[in-house]
Amino acid sequence: MKKCVYTDELLQAKVRIVSTRWQVEACTAQARNPAGITAGQNVLSLESFAAQIHPAETVDRATALWFLRDLLRTIPVGRYQRIAKEVGFPAVLFGWISTLIGEKIEPDALAGPQKDLRALYAAYLSRLKERGLRSREMAIAAAAEKAAKETVGTINVSGFIDFRAVEMDFLDALAEKNEITVVLQKYGANAFVKAREAAF
């Protein structure tokens, strides 16, 4: 890693990465941030930035929900069978599966009550692979493999306290060739220590 600085100020950077799209919109909407640096085209969500490093066809939410509804028709889900036909169940599954992928948890690692969903999770991953699609988290993981070789310049990262394992791996790989400033935005001393231990 070249350099990692922790600060509560937004410094001038070639790219500013934030954790979500709504944060990008919020940054772009305000003409200037408190530090007086213009927020503009260089503000990207981590997902968008990863797509620039390694373009990948990601599955949209509607398609993912359709896949899950279809799989629920044929794959038994044990103790969850009673609620499997509920309208909101595929959306809950989508969020849960996204979290599992983001934390790099494989279907075989599921235990306890979650093991009833092991076959469904594995089938969902297979369906994505068959269609040549990736989840947002898979796309970020693929970008991480390439990121260690990419030189971008100075990068500000904020909102990363919410990042999951796959996103942290991406930032870690990116730090191999780039200077990264982690912007904590006055989270306090405890967050600073936690962030430093978790990230780098």
Residues of each region from the PLM?
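A general structural motif
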Residues: 1, 11-13, 150-154, 177-179
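Basic/charged alpha-beta structural segments of nucleotide/phosphate-handling enzymes
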Residues: 4-5, 10, 21-151, 165, ...
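N-terminal start-of-chain detector that recognizes signal peptides
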Residues: 15-16, 126-128, 153-156
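Acidic, metal-coordinating catalytic cores used for nucleic-acid/nucleotide bond scission
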Residues: 15-24, 161
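Structural recognition of the conserved hydrophobic beta-strand(s) that form the central parallel beta-sheet
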Residues: 16-18, 156, 179-185
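Conserved P-loop NTPase "ATPase switch" module shared by AAA+ and STAND
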Residues: 151-163
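Conserved RecA-like helicase ATPase core segment
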Residues: 166-200
